[in-house]
Structure formats: structure tokens, C-alpha cells
């Protein structure tokens, strides 16, 4: 949690099962402590692109506040998922192969399945 939140925001990290045995996905969550059960209209799910994991995109402070913190401070229940092979999610075994012999890290169709698992 960044200093500017003054304990107002709750930061949670989860590991959930994906649709593939042995692959877990990391979820980051940020929300205000003073808001009870969030509604579906205020829940946001973020997913990174093909280069960086969610934390390095959405949870890095700029001018002392991250994108996730700003959204949560505004009252949103913010979630960010790392597709397999990124951030705190499980690295598939084929990631150990040399880059010139391996398939793309996580094709879009697989990342879409990971997003569906998180939702």
C-alpha cells in the first residue's frame, strides 16, 4: 500500500486455479476499507498485455499513487490478474525452453481463458 492511502485502502493478493492443472493465477485486489460488499457496477478487472505483469503496469506509484489506488480511492473494487507466465502466476514448463524454440509466452486465446478463470 502506498503512503498516500493512509490505511484507507485494503490490498489483497490471491492465487487461484486456472483451467489447466498445475497452473495458478495471481490476482491483486485493491478496495476501500470503509465500503462493505461491492456491487457489480463498481467492480473492475484489469489484465496486462504481452510485455509486463499487472503489478508493474497498474500498481506502480506515479506522483505517490498507483492506478489501482486511484481507482480504489474513487470507490471501485479493483482486481488485476496475471496471465500464466507473468508476475506471481505459475510459469508453464515450456518457458524453460530456449526462446528460439519455444512458442509465444501466453497466446491471447490462453490469456482470455485465464481472464475467464479469474472472473
Annotate each PLM feature.
Residues 34-80:
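Short, surface-exposed "cap/lid" segments of acyl-processing enzymes
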Residues 55, 81-105:
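Glycine-rich "HGGG/HGxG" loop immediately N-terminal to the catalytic nucleophile
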Residues 26-28, 42, 58, 86:
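Generic hydrophobic, helix-prone segments enriched in Leu/Val/Ile
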Residues 1-3, 75-78, 86-88:
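Glycine/serine-rich loop-strand microenvironments at binding/catalytic pocket rims
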Residues 99-119:
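Alpha/beta-hydrolase active-site loop
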Residues 2-39:
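N-terminal cap/lid segment of alpha/beta-hydrolase-fold proteins
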Amino acid at each position: 500500500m502506498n503512503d498516500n492511502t493512509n490505511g484507507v485502502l485494503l490490498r489483497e493478493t490471491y492465487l487461484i486455479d486456472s483451467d489447466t492443472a498445475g497452473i495458478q493465477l495471481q490476482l491483486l485486489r485493491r478496495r476501500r476499507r470503509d465500503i462493505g460488499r461491492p456491487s457489480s457496477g463498481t467492480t473492475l478487472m484489469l489484465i496486462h498485455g504481452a510485455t509486463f505483469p499487472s503489478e508493474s503496469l497498474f500498481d506502480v506509484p506515479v506522483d505517490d499513487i498507483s492506478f489501482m489506488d486511484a481507482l480504489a480511492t474513487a470507490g471501485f473494487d479493483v482486481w488485476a490478474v496475471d496471465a500464466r507466465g507473468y508476475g506471481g502466476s505459475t510459469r508453464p514448463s515450456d518457458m524453460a525452453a530456449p526462446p528460439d524454440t519455444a512458442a509465444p509466452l501466453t497466446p491471447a486465446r490462453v490469456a482470455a481463458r485465464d481472464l475467464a478463470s479469474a472472473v
